[in-house]
Structure formats: C-alpha cells, structure tokens
Curated annotation (Swiss-Prot):
The species this protein was found in: Arabidopsis thaliana (Mouse-ear cress)
UniProtKB keywords: Cytoplasm, Metal-binding, Nucleus, Ubl conjugation pathway, Zinc, Zinc-finger
Name of the protein described by the UniProt record: BTB/POZ and TAZ domain-containing protein 1
Example GO molecular function: calmodulin binding
UniProt note: domains: The BTB/POZ domain mediates the interaction with some component of ubiquitin ligase complexes.
Superkingdom to which the source organism belongs: Eukaryota
Protein purpose: May act as a substrate-specific adapter of an E3 ubiquitin-protein ligase complex (CUL3-RBX1-BTB) which mediates the ubiquitination and subsequent proteasomal degradation of target proteins. Also targeted for degradation by the 26S proteasome pathway. May be involved in gametophyte development.
Location of region: CaM-binding: 315-338
Zn finger (TAZ-type) start-end: 205-304
Disulfide bonds: none
Length: 365
C-alpha cells in the first residue's frame, strides 16, 4: 500500500505487501538544502548495512524530537529524495537516471545498496559521452564499478581523438597523471591485442589456403582436373586425354595445375634448384609429403622420396618453423575435413528426411 513518508519534497514512497501508513516515522534525513525527509528505520536498515550501523548508534535528541537524524550531504536534494524512495520501492525512471544517475551511483556505493548500484552502473554507462566520460571514469574508479570503468576505457579508446580535445581530458592531464597513464596503457594494450588478432587471422587464412592447396594436389594427382590428371608425367608435356570439368575449388586448383605444368617443363629445374615457381612447387610437394600419412600408396610425385629422405634444414630455427608450419597446416586440413564431413552428413540426413516425407505423403494420397 502507499505510504506518506515525505512532507515537503513531493516524493511518494511505496511499499509492497506491508502497510506503513499507520506507522510513525522515526528517522529524519537531512539534505544539503536542509530538506527534511521522514523515513522508517526498519525500511532503511533492511536495505542498507551502512544505514543500519548509523541507526543503531546512540540517538541524539534535536529540538525535543525523538527521531534519529541522518545527514546525506554533498548531492542535490532531489537525488536524495529519489535515493530514499528507492529504498522503499526499487524503481528509478529514465528521467531521474538522466538527471541524478552519477549522484545515485555515489550514494549507492557509500550506503552499499547493491541493487541500486547495479542499475546506476548500467544507466550511467548508457549515457557516456565524449564530454563526460573522464568524469564518469573517475567516479567509477572511486565507486568500485569495474564494468563501468571498462566501458569508459573502451569509449576513450574508440574516440580518443575527440576525448583528448575536451576540458575533462585536459583537467585529467594536469591533476591525475597516473590515471592518464593507465588510460594510455589500456589503449596501447588494446591496439596490441588488435594487431595480434589480425596477425592470427592472416595466419589462419594462410594455413587454410595451404590446406586447400594440399587437397587440390591430391585431387589433381588422383582424380585429375581440367588441365592435369593422374596420367600426366611431370617430366614431359603429356596430359590426360579425358579432361573432367572444374572442381569445387577451381580457383586454387587451376593455379596449381599451371604450376605443375611449368614444373614439368622448366629447363632451370635441376635437383630442386630452378626458378621461383619451381621452388614454390617443390615446397608444396615437400609440405604434402610432411603431412601425408599414406606415402606408400600416394600418387603425388616425390611424396615417397621426400618421406624416405627425411631431409633436414641447415638451420635449427628454419627446421622449427617448418615443423610448426606442417603441424598447423595439418590441423587446418583436419578441421576442414571435419567440417566438410559434418556438412555432407547433414545434407544426407536432410535428403533422407525429405524422401521420407515424400514417401509418407504418397502413401496418404
């Protein structure tokens, strides 16, 4: 039921299930503007442990009144009224959050009102701008609001050129150099992470391309494609008489076929030494040999020779890099095969379900 717990501030307080309209207020909250807000100690103590400690202290009598006096100073009177009303009925309007969000955040932290602090953290975070982000960040650090701190840091990172032109940033540079250093360090770390992610994506794309190239080499040497087939001899110009149509990875496969044709007829190719294109082909064949697990029956040229030779690089650093490359390409190939297998299985299941539905429909007709 509704209760009347204010006299001059015009803020009505609501309580659910319990009626306090017949209970006399025993606490008087005084604001900076000397506004008096009557309240019930039972309500205040049930929500805020800080107010509980204040209420339990020996009572001081003021002007013959037996009410406990609690002073909440340093914030607007209306903000205190909204704060007290929240203790009775946990609700804050958008307009109140717009006007008193930062004040309510400070009050919720000081008086340990967790529910209000969570709402203020979210509400204030939604209202961050280039002009107020520095002030909100400082308040968030004082109020131990890590989520709001992180949001402000990210905002400054994304719009740093705009933020550094504001008065808040200039004030920060003059009066809080340690916070400025923390912000710049956060921006530097974020940029470093972004560069690492970009490099990782480029590397993953490279491994996927090499994995696709390995599959295309096996496809060319086993099944054949438009230009080169399994009956081709890399040491002469002969090609398959029957040429199949383009495969699903034709863009990669076509380039490899041209590379294989060149490798077969290049006059500079002598014991692995030759032009750049020949060296590239040798590297691809060597990479295939390193990840191939069927070298005895493999139809890719030089696969068995490279496997048996077990060649070693002259430098250990190069050998280590090569091993890492082989391992990651093999992993990318395995993941690609797994995804393709799942896709094929789903297509088969979908086809079977469709056939079952057609069969059932035909029976019903």
């Amino acid at each position: 039921m509704a209760i009347t717990a204010t006299q001059n501030d015009g803020v009505s307080l609501n309580a659910n299930k319990i009626s306090y309209d017949l209970v006399e207020t025993d606490v008087e909250i005084i604001t900076s503007g000397r506004r008096s807000i009557p309240a019930h100690s039972g309500i205040l103590a049930s929500v805020s442990p800080v107010l509980t400690n204040i209420i339990e202290k020996p009572r001081k009598i003021h002007g013959g009144s037996s009410k406990k006096v609690i002073k909440i100073l340093g914030v607007p009177c209306d903000a205190v009224s909204v704060f007290v009303r929240f203790l009775y009925s946990p609700s804050v309007t958008e307009n109140e959050m717009e006007k008193y969000g930062i004040h309510l955040l400070a009050l919720s932290h000081v008086y340990m009102v967790t529910q209000l602090k969570q709402r203020c953290t979210k509400g204030v975070g939604e209202r961050v701008t280039a002009e107020n982000v520095v002030d909100i960040l400082q308040l968030a650090r004082l109020c131990d609001a890590p989520d709001l701190c992180l949001k402000c840091m990210r905002f400054i990172h994304y719009k740093f050129k705009t933020v550094e032109q504001t008065e808040g940033w200039k004030f920060l540079q003059e009066h809080d150099p340690f916070l400025e250093l923390d912000i710049l360090q956060f921006i530097d770390d974020a940029e470093s992470r972004k560069k690492r992610r970009r490099r990782h994506r480029r590397e993953q794309n490279l491994y996927l391309q090499l994995s696709e190239a390995m599959e295309c080499i096996e496809h060319i040497c086993t099944e054949g494609c438009t230009l080169v087939g399994p009956s081709s001899n890399l040491d002469n110009k002969s090609t398959c008489q029957a040429k199949p149509g383009p495969c699903s990875a034709f863009s990669t496969c076509y380039g490899l076929q041209l590379l294989i044709r060149h490798f077969a007829v290049c006059k500079k190719r002598v014991d692995g030494k030759g032009c750049v294109r020949c060296k590239r082909m040798i590297q691809l064949l060597r990479l295939h040999s390193s990840i191939c697990d069927q070298s005895e029956s493999c139809r890719v040229p030089l696969c068995r020779q490279y496997k048996n030779r077990g060649e070693k690089d002259k430098k250990m650093v190069e050998d280590t890099k090569w091993k890492v490359l082989v391992r990651r390409v093999a992993s990318a190939k395995a993941m690609s095969s797994l995804s393709q297998s799942k896709k094929k299985k789903s297509e088969v299941l979908f086809k079977e379900e469709a056939e079952d539905l057609i069969r059932i429909r035909n029976k019903l007709m």
